[in-house]
Structure formats: structure tokens, C-alpha cells
Amino acid sequence: MTAGTRTVVLAANSLWYITNFRTGLVRALRDAGYRPIVVAPADPKNEGRLAELGIEFVPIKIDRKGLNPIVELSLLSRLSRLLRRLRPSAYVGFTIKPNIYGAVAASRLRIPVIANVSGLGTAFIRRGALQRTVTGLYRIAFRRAVVFFENADDRQLFVDRRILRPEQARLVPGSGIDLDSFVVADLPSDETIFLLIARLIGDKGVREFVEAARSLRQRMPHARFQLLGGIDEGNRTSIQKPELDAWVHAGVIEYLGETDDVRPFIAKASAVVLPSYREGLPRSLLEGAAMGRPLIATDVPGCRDVVDEGVNGFLCESRNPVSLADAMWRLGSLPEQQRSSMGAAARRKVQEQFSEALVIRAYLNALAGLQRN
């Protein structure tokens, strides 16, 4: 494999992330004359999806949640060797460890860096030694990087903590939504279904969703509350299977498992819900909005960027199942025409502010700027 002046390495902690959220960007890079090379842990299923697109893939071992310093230094070493061999014209990092260690490795080799902070995650939500450690690592890694943020709150936090300079930080509307893939579906007229799409971790507000559903059983006896997403064993706030099974057994929620295609589930839902503690720019809300679904979310960074109170949905207080239940009750009590109007407003907002084309243009412009410099 030879190095090329137009090679761009894109790295993430899972190949699933790239194939589900960044395929449009990878294709656009290829079509613009770049040679994109994706770097992530081995994943035969998603490697096949990349191969179908004719995109090169290099597997690398990443312990997504581990904090062992020896293991972390080993990852830095592997990324350094890989980038020294490929000598790309730019390194693009997604997710926390490829962002930090990839940026450090690339900077040492004088390879320009673009990093994407798609949310601050558990390390920033929960204060303490871990937050201080991650802040310090970001400060080292992003010294010379161009950094894309998905909401203004996260951008300002990094600037205020002097992790980076204001001129390094740019806003981009998430990973963008392919509006040709996510099309409007008619709202169900015969039942009310609230759908939460998320990894099963506490920080996504899963327990608040369950408690809100439990409290609404008498007021809304015919409403259904559905949970779609996989158990994230490695996360410190992960929901464990016995707890999930108890909710299902009690008839509080329906668990739909996990999927690579959320569209059929959104099409059957009346509203998409996300009671998260903090987000970058929540894709589940954007996908629901693109399909014409009213939204219910917490009034926190990321979520409030997508939901306009009373226009395309309702906001509620974070970590407050009573407030969440009230928002779901308000939406469920609306006449069908008003729900449809909210769904139409949600779709328009995605078209105007969050389309994939806007995101791709931002990355191509950033790469062109790096080439000029």
C-alpha cells in the first residue's frame, strides 16, 4: 500500500459507526478525488459493506472503554505506526479515543488533523478525576487540530476550558441525514406509540423513560412505550439485562432489540423520544424528524438544538421522569392534525439545517483549507 498526497484516513472506535453514519462522507471524499482509508476494529459484516463501495479498510484493535495506561499507550503506538506507513494528507477522527490518540500520533508526524466531537459522553457528564484526565488529553491532542462540534454548548465549553482556541472550533450539523433515505411516513391513526432509540445506558435517560411510561399507564392505558437499541456492556452506566427483562415482564415497555435500520420502527411510531442527559446532535431525533415524527427530548445541549418547543415537539427537564411524562401526555392529547403539523415542522427543520449535504460540504471545505495551508 503506497502513500498518496490525497489520502485521507478516517478512524473511529467501531466500523459500525462509519458504515451507519459516515458512508455519505466517505463516498463524497472518493468522488472528490481523495483516497479514503477507514481505520476501525475488525467487523466482518461492516467490512463487507465498505468493500461493496470499493473503500479501503485497515483493522486496528481499540479497547473502547478501557482506561489501562499501558493499553492506551499501545493504541497510540499502533496509530503512530499506521500513519507513518500510510502518510495521509489528513487524519479525520471520530469518537473519543481515535480523536485523542489519533490526533496526537498525526500531529507528531505533521499530518493535519480534523476531529469531530459528537458529544461529550459519560466522562464529561460525570465530574471527577476521569473528567479532568480526559480534558487534559483533549488539550494535548487538539493543539493544532481543526475541531468540528455538533452544538454550540460543547464548542463553548471547550473554548472556555482552554482546550482549544476559538478559531480552531467549527460547528457542523452532526453527521447529517440522507433525506432521500429517510422519507416522511404517515403517522399511525389508531394508536399512540412513543419510541426511544438509544444505546441502553443510563445517560440516555432510559430509566426516566421507563418511569414515565409506568406513571402514564392509567392516564394513557392504550399508549405503547417502545425501546430500540442494544445493551452497551462496556459503558459505566449500562442497563443490564435483568433490569431490562423486569421492565418487559411488568408490561411497562416493549423491547424491540437492536437494528441496523431504524426506519421501519420510526414509521410505526407516533413520536420519537430522547430523555438524554447531554448530546452532541442526537441522530435518533434527526432521523425521527426527517420521517415526520414529533419529538420529545430533554432541554439539554444537543437535544434543544433539534426540538423547538411547541413547534416540532416538546422539551422536558433532564433526569425528571415526571416532566417527561407530562411532555408525553401533552403530545398524546393533541388532535391528529396538530401532531401531523408538528411532524411536518420537524421534517422542514432537518431539510433546512441538518441535511447530509451540508455536513459533507463542511468537511470538503476543511480539507481543501488544509491542502492550501
Ranges and model annotations:
Residues 20-21, 70-77, 112-114, 121-143, ...:
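Nucleotide-sugar donor phosphate/pyrophosphate-binding loop at the beta->alpha transition
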Residues 39-45, 197, 224-239:
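Glycosyltransferase donor-sugar binding loop
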Residues 58, 139-184:
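Donor nucleotide-sugar binding/catalytic pocket of nucleotide-sugar-dependent glycosyltransferases
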Residues 186-204, 210-214, 226:
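Conserved donor-binding/catalytic core segment of Leloir-type glycosyltransferases
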Residues 258, 277:
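Aromatic "clamp/platform" in nucleotide-sugar-dependent glycosyltransferases that forms part
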Residues 294-297, 307:
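Short hydrophobic beta-strand element within catalytic cores of glycosyltransferases
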Residues 308-310, 314-321, 330-336:
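Conserved acidic donor-binding segment of nucleotide-sugar-dependent glycosyltransferases
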Residues 330, 337-353, 359-362:
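A short, well-ordered alpha-helix in the C-terminal region of glycosyltransferases
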